[in-house]
């Protein structure tokens, strides 16, 4: 059988692509080296932020607004346990923060619902938060967080119900191109398709070693909290920048545990074996202490944590482009630790590519050629 589309990597983007392409009527094969959702990539740990006024640059705003529409649609499949939780997101940092300047600019350009607070206003609204006098907060009322593993599980189930073929726990070992399309090699045999999507995450260079993607080991952890820090008490998800430039992100507490991670830093790695479990690097359990001690002093000790991996591009912007010399293969990689919120729209973009539809978005900033 020759498929319309083969998806290599069925984590966040691949799961979405499988669903949207199958829903569009294509004959699709989803593949993954493991059984998604799983612990081997970048999507585990239960939750991911979604921010609309984007500190990484306004070029992302049209994408994230469409992503939000798709997340809302997906959430309707899980109304008892919604995939998207509109907790709000408070972005904290010094008044001269470049990141916060980008958030404010994005909000102004796209007329987003963002409220600016000074230090006293932040602490009055959320007494659990402490910030210096020179800090400001930009509160995104309509943003919140996503249940990442539930989302992937839902997409995979919906795709399967729609007739999508799924080959999991079976790594793709090679990709070949010829006049007939794309062929992948696996331990289960060879499979052919007219087109392919490569969204293999951290280890995409195992298949395409020439790509400018650097795996980085990262950790996040859960710390002892209480009901004051919960969504029920209107405690928001957050990003926070310390005076030294270190950037953190976190979520409202659930079951008396508040999850937090540090966005910058981490350990450069070159193989999956180098991504050692949480606590095997001496700094893992204390990485969030500078932020917690200064901004959330009521949070207690580290309860547990996990390691994941970023697939960083050189400029930490996404790579969304066809494979050089092979216009029938789309790369979506280099998501650099801020990609999950876009998984829905990136999956839709992949499905459009498979149908020869022109994208509704300007993807020029994400081309591979910018690194030449």
From Swiss-Prot:
**What binding partners and quaternary form does the record give?**
Monomer.
E.C. number: 1.5.3.-
Of which family is this protein a member? Answer: Belongs to the MSOX/MTOX family. MTOX subfamily.
- So which cofactors does this thing need? FAD
User: Matching SUPFAM superfamilies, A to Z?
Assistant: FAD-linked reductases, C-terminal domain (SSF54373), FAD/NAD(P)-binding domain (SSF51905)
Which positions carry S-8alpha-FAD cysteine?
A: 308
Listed name of the protein: N-methyl-L-tryptophan oxidase
Q: Name one GO cellular component term.
A: cytosol
The protein's gene is named: solA
What residues does FAD bind to?
4-34
The source's domain of life comes to Bacteria
Q: Does the keyword Secreted apply?
A: no
InterPro entries from the UniProt entry: FAD-dep_OxRdtase, FAD/NAD-bd_sf, Me_Trp_Oxase_MTOX, MTOX
Q: Identify a single GO molecular function assigned to this protein.
A: flavin adenine dinucleotide binding
Which catalysed reactions does the entry list for this protein? N(alpha)-methyl-L-tryptophan + O2 + H2O = L-tryptophan + formaldehyde + H2O2
Gene3D superfamilies with a match to the protein in the record = D-Amino Acid Oxidase, subunit A, domain 2, FAD/NAD(P)-binding domain
Role noted for this protein = Catalyzes the oxidative demethylation of N-methyl-L-tryptophan.
Tell me how the cofactor is bound: Binds 1 FAD per subunit.
- Does this UniProt record's set of keywords contain Flavoprotein? yes
Instruction: Enumerate the HAMAP family for this protein.
Output: MTOX
């Amino acid at each position: 059988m020759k498929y319309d589309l083969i998806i290599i990597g069925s984590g966040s983007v691949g799961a979405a692509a499988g669903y949207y392409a199958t829903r569009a009527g294509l004959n699709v094969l989803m593949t993954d080296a493991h059984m998604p959702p799983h612990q081997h990539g970048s999507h585990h740990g239960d939750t991911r932020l979604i921010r609309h006024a984007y500190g990484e640059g306004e070029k992302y705003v049209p994408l994230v607004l469409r992503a939000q529409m798709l997340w809302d649609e997906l959430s309707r499949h899980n109304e008892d346990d919604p995939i998207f939780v509109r907790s709000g997101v408070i972005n904290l940092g010094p008044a001269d923060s470049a990141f916060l300047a980008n958030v404010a600019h994005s909000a102004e350009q796209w007329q987003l619902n963002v409220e600016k607070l000074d230090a006293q206003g932040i602490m009055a609204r959320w007494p659990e938060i402490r910030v210096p006098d020179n800090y400001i907060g930009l509160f995104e009322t309509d943003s919140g967080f996503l249940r990442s593993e539930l989302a992937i599980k839902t997409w995979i189930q919906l795709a399967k119900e729609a007739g999508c073929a799924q080959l999991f726990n079976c790594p793709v070992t090679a990709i070949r191109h010829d006049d007939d399309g794309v062929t992948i090699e696996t331990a289960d045999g060879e499979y052919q398709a007219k087109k392919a999507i490569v969204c293999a995450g951290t280890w995409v260079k195992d298949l395409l070693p020439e790509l400018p993607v650097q795996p980085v080991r990262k950790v996040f952890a859960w710390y002892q909290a209480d009901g004051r820090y919960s969504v029920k008490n209107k405690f928001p998800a957050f990003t926070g920048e310390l005076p030294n430039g270190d950037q953190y992100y976190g979520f409202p507490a659930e079951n008396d545990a508040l999850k937090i991670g540090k966005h910058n830093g981490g350990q450069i790695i070159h193989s999956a074996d180098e991504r050692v479990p949480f606590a095997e690097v001496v700094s893992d359990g204390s990485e969030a202490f500078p932020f917690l001690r200064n901004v959330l002093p009521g949070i207690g000790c580290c309860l547990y944590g996990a390691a994941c991996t970023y697939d960083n591009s050189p400029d930490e912007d996404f790579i969304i482009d066809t494979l050089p010399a092979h216009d029938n293969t789309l790369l979506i990689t280099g998501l650099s630790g801020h990609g999950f919120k876009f998984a829905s729209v990136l999956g839709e973009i992949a499905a459009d590519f498979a149908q020869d539809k022109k994208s509704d978005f300007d993807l020029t900033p994400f081309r591979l050629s910018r690194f030449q």
